[in-house]
């Protein structure tokens, strides 16, 4: 507990029950250091029917549809992604939460406990998955493309409906 007394931020990514069993849950640690900011990253959140499950990036990639989508786009058999999007997305969402908590702690003087579920961070970061789940892939943002023009290459990245409106405007 000596480390906790002087700690600024604690980051852990166990299943939600592990830190409590070790006596290291936020409620206990906050008694030692009320300014502590704790980030907990789990696969499926701290409550709910899947919260007990351990998670690894390939599991999250599969359950969010990333593996299926990549396989269909490339006409390949399903395989894990070459990068760990689930870990990266959860970490970035966690970082935003921690930075916000630091600002709040500077104003209020107390820390916070931030919880990030890898599955939530991954689903809500990949808008293409959401469009696919809603059955509206053809109305969502289109992939960007580089076009050769007389004045040089031009990148177009926009919602296709908005682009059509702009192109037909005088």
Can you say where each PLM-predicted feature lies in the sequence?
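A structured beta-alpha segment of the ubiquitous adenosine-cofactor-binding alpha/beta core
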Residues: 1-31
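Structural scaffold positions in well-ordered secondary structure
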Residues: 11, 29, 38, 57, ...
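Short glycine-/small-residue-rich Rossmann-like dinucleotide-binding loops
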Residues: 15-16, 42-43, 64
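Structural detector of well-ordered beta-strand residues that form the stable sheet scaffold
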Residues: 37-39, 155
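Generic beta-sheet signal
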Residues: 39-41, 56-62, 69
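Acidic, glycine-rich segments within the central catalytic cores of soluble metabolic enzymes
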Residues: 47, 61-170
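Conserved NAD(P)+-binding/catalytic subdomain of aldehyde/semialdehyde dehydrogenases
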Residues: 49-53
């Amino acid at each position: 507990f000596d480390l906790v007394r002087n700690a600024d931020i604690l980051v852990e990514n166990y299943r939600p029950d592990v830190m409590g069993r070790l006596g290291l849950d936020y409620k206990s640690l906050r008694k030692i250091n009320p300014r502590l900011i704790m980030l907990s990253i789990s696969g499926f959140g701290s409550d709910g029917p899947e919260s007990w499950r351990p998670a690894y990036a390939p599991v999250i990639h599969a359950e969010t549809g990333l593996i299926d989508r990549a396989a269909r786009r490339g006409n390949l058999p399903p395989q894990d992604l070459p990068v760990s999007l689930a870990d990266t997305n959860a970490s970035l969402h966690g970082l935003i939460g921690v930075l916000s908590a630091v600002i709040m702690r500077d104003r209020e003087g107390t820390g916070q406990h931030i919880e990030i579920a890898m599955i939530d961070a991954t689903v809500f970061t990949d808008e293409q998955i959401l469009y696919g789940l809603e059955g509206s892939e053809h109305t969502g943002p289109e992939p960007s493309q580089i076009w050769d023009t007389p004045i040089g290459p031009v990148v177009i990245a926009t919602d296709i409906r908005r682009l059509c409106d702009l192109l037909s405007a005088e």
